[in-house]
């Protein structure tokens, strides 16, 4: 049950006062339609997929691609992405599902939250690459078409974390602190009422990044995988600094959270690849675009 604030903006949950300017957490995570339980987290993921599909489809057709092929590869990518995202989450957070007192089959309850973006992008990307290889489609053209929409989709998906009251950051007294119910606060932080809204930080970062990608592509037409590589660099850089604020349980490599290390490694790789591609293909212009299909 969500703890309500008394007049004057103070929390009834105990601990630190809640600022009148703080961001409230939603009081529900799901709603019912007859016998069906609709989880808002799932709706956010679905909305993100729709945005990426519409954006990517239009951009892919503008590159000379066929809509029916785009629909097929998107269907494969979504299925593979969800499986990959869930696998990454279950593997890296296996203690949540396996061991004494745990219910192993809850690892299949994807609607409760828990998708690792690294697994989603990796397996989803592999599915697209295999499809492109089979159909004679340029993978780079598909990736560049999808890049802005994927980043926008990730922003929308972060709203699901808000409804689930999960993946927030350290306690803060800043006016945009996020109110978290007592039942959702991790051990050692029960006395705090407001936390960094890391979901919002990543949401804003991703939306700004998506707009930037669209602007860059319109200005210079980055092709041959350069726009997608730039997307990877933008996302991982933002994920790195946002991850530094989070306090949810995580595996560590030394003093660093695993996602921090992953983001740093992938960011470095993306920058190196972007430099190589830029040297190979030049700045680019509005008349230079990588076609969707390979020349036979």
UniProtKB/Swiss-Prot annotation:
One GO CC annotation: plasma membrane
Keyword Membrane in annotation = yes
InterPro entries tied to this protein: Lgt (IPR001640)
The molecular function GO annotations come to:
phosphatidylglycerol-prolipoprotein diacylglyceryl transferase activity
Give the principal location in a single coarse category.
membrane
Enzyme Commission identifier(s)? 2.5.1.145
Q: What is this protein called?
A: Phosphatidylglycerol--prolipoprotein diacylglyceryl transferase
């Amino acid at each position: 049950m969500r703890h309500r604030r008394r007049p004057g903006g103070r929390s009834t949950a105990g601990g630190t006062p809640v600022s009148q300017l703080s961001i409230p957490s939603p009081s529900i995570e799901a709603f019912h339609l007859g016998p069906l339980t609709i989880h808002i987290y799932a709706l956010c993921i679905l909305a993100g997929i729709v945005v990426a599909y519409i954006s990517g489809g239009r951009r892919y057709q503008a590159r000379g691609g066929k809509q029916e092929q785009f629909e097929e590869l998107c269907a494969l990518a979504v299925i593979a992405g969800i499986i990959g995202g869930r696998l990454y989450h279950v593997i890296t957070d296996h203690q949540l599902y396996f061991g004494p007192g745990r219910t192993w089959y809850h690892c299949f309850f994807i609607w409760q939250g828990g998708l690792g973006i690294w697994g989603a992008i990796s397996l989803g990307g592999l599915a697209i690459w295999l499809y492109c290889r089979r159909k004679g489609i340029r993978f780079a053209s598909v990736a560049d078409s999808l890049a802005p929409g994927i980043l926008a989709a990730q922003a929308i998906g972060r709203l699901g974390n808000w409804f689930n009251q999960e993946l927030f950051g350290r306690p803060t007294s800043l006016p945009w602190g996020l109110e978290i119910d007592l039942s959702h606060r991790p051990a050692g932080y029960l006395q705090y009422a407001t936390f960094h809204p890391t979901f919002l930080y990543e949401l804003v970062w991703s939306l700004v990044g998506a707009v930037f990608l669209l602007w860059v592509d319109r200005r210079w037409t980055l092709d041959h995988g350069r726009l997608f590589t730039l997307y990877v660099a933008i996302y991982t850089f933002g994920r790195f600094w946002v991850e530094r604020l989070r306090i949810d349980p995580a595996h560590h490599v030394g003093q660093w959270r695993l996602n921090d290390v992953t983001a740093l490694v992938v960011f470095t790789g993306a920058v190196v690849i972007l430099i190589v591609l830029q040297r190979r293909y030049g700045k680019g212009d509005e008349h230079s675009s990588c076609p969707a299909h390979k020349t036979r």
